[in-house]
Amino acid sequence: MEFRILYPSALLTQFVKYYWVFERNYLVRTIERGIPIGCMQLVFHRKNRVFSTAINDFQPKAFIEGHMSSYWDLQYEGENETIAITFTPQGVQAFFSTPLYEFYNKNIPVECIGDRLFIDLQQAILNADDKMDCIGIIECYLLEKIKNLKPEIAVSEVIIQQIEYDCNTSIEWLANVSN
């Protein structure tokens, strides 16, 4: 079994909390429990798909996992290789135009998001020779996506960073920055 956490490049740290890579060969069907982490994720299953009790179905090959409100069980069998992007709570909005509440307690297939870039990313990840090469591929795609970042997202990031830095920041200051 291999489980690794990798951190994003400096340009992506305000959007991506970390990447994780999981690989294991399950000789028998195995159930493992998933717990909410408070962040949305973009998940890729490069080998066998995983059955999730959260959606009572097999997870798609590539999907957005919204905020989950409770634990769920995952059934693994055979060779599994999962690569995921865990977004920062505020960073996810830079990549998806869909309102975030629409992802709540759901696993939305990449094809349903309506963004060609993520469909291309899915194909690149599934076709990559090595799981560690996938992180570099992901970084390139995400950097391409933030080139067209909406100004209001950049402003909200500044506001969140200021609140995290100094919780006594005045409402007036925050309002002035946001306008």
List each language-model region with its residue ranges.
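Alpha-helical bundle regulatory/interaction domains
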Residues: 1-172, 176-178
